[in-house]
């Protein structure tokens, strides 16, 4: 079995155990907030987990604001080993990379054609010093555009697993229950199949509104459409997430700097700048506040299902590689 083709991207990401690409067929379905919740839920699974979060929406970056890093102090540092992501917490367990950190004015628009976007995406993948990561979550723009093609082109060498490294990029789909959103989700699913990107499942977001007064659930955008589509298309259904007013208030507070306070973590040494951590479990305000929401409990179950599916996917790959090796040996 051939080894993974070595490229600047494959070398840089060799210390990343799992890559999860978050996709949606259309905008406004809560994909970016889902990416943030997935990252936080992965961190909550273990105090030693380290997660990276890439904002691949070049023309409309939103992750810095969602994690409380939309501040002048949140800037990308250059270390001896490459760009350094901006860390959300003192323990440097959650690092974020976004073009939003590179703009002189956070209100500036990014008017780029495909080739320039491709160059930035390549830099995000090959020049960011993540260190050892358990998970790298990549939040993509809605639809299927230049960004998606560039991403999968640069990740292509990682689609050739070996016995020593069965990790390949995987993805999840985010949709709301309405027919329009689901139709666009089918297009994203078709895209993943054409490019052989494994889909671990679908999340039905905004699936009901929980009244904060009486607790009654109203199916504002319909119900069950995502689950029905997932079953029909043979895609795992990971769960449905209702609208959580507490989460909305939390994200608003985070964007105003009322949760993190000081904002981005300052890098005081080259070791710290390169993302090294001693595995400490220091105070993590954003994670602590998030775990108080109803959404965190829903995403806990979704994340566990996703992790189980990823591990099964890797196990299946190893089994196929072993079977192939045995066949070649007999021949």
Swiss-Prot record:
Positions bound to [4Fe-4S] cluster: 211, 214
GO molecular function per UniProt: 4 iron, 4 sulfur cluster binding; ATP binding; ATP hydrolysis activity; ATP-dependent FeS chaperone activity; iron-sulfur cluster binding; metal ion binding
Domain of life where this protein originates: Eukaryota
GO CC terms of this entry: cytosol; cytosolic [4Fe-4S] assembly scaffold complex
Co-factor note (free text): Binds 4 [4Fe-4S] clusters per heterotetramer. Contains two stable clusters in the N-termini of NBP35 and two labile, bridging clusters between subunits of the NBP35-CFD1 heterotetramer.
GO biological process, one term: iron-sulfur cluster assembly
Similarity comment: Belongs to the Mrp/NBP35 ATP-binding proteins family. NUBP2/CFD1 subfamily.
Subunit architecture: Heterotetramer of 2 NBP35 and 2 CFD1 chains.
Role description: Component of the cytosolic iron-sulfur (Fe/S) protein assembly (CIA) machinery. Required for maturation of extramitochondrial Fe-S proteins. The NBP35-CFD1 heterotetramer forms a Fe-S scaffold complex, mediating the de novo assembly of an Fe-S cluster and its transfer to target apoproteins.
Name of the protein in its database record: Cytosolic Fe-S cluster assembly factor CFD1
């Amino acid at each position: 079995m051939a080894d993974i083709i070595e490229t600047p991207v494959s070398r840089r990401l060799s210390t990343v155990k799992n890559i999860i690409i978050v996709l949606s067929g259309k905008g406004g379905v809560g994909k970016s907030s889902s990416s943030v919740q997935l990252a936080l839920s992965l961190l909550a699974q273990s105090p030693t987990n380290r997660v990276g979060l890439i904002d691949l929406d070049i023309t409309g970056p939103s992750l810095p604001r969602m994690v409380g890093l939309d501040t002048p102090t949140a800037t990308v540092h250059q270390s001896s080993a490459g760009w350094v992501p901006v860390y959300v917490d003192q323990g440097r367990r959650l690092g974020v990379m976004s073009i939003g950190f590179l703009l002189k004015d956070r209100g500036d628009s990014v008017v780029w054609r495909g080739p320039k976007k491709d160059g930035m995406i390549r830099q995000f993948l090959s020049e960011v010093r993540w260190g050892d990561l358990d998970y790298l979550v990549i939040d993509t723009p809605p639809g299927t555009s230049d960004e998606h093609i560039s991403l999968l082109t640069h990740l292509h060498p990682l689609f050739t697993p070996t016995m020593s490294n069965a990790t390949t990029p995987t993805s999840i789909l985010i949709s709301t229950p309405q027919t329009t959103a689901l139709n666009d989700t089918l297009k994203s699913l078709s895209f993943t199949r054409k490019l052989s990107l494994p889909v671990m499942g679908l999340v039905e977001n905004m699936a009901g509104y929980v009244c904060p007064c009486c607790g009654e659930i109203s199916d504002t955008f319909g119900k069950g459409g995502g689950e029905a589509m997932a079953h029909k298309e043979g895609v795992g259904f990971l769960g449905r997430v209702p609208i959580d007013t507490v989460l909305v208030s939390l994200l608003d507070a985070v964007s105003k700097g009322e949760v993190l306070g000081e904002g981005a973590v300052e890098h005081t040494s080259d070791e710290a700048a390169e993302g090294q951590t001693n595995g400490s479990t220091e105070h993590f305000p954003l994670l602590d506040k998030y775990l108080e929401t109803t959404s965190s409990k829903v995403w806990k179950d979704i994340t566990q299902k996703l992790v189980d599916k990823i591990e099964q996917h890797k196990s299946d790959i190893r089994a196929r590689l072993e079977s192939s090796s045995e066949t070649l040996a007999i021949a």
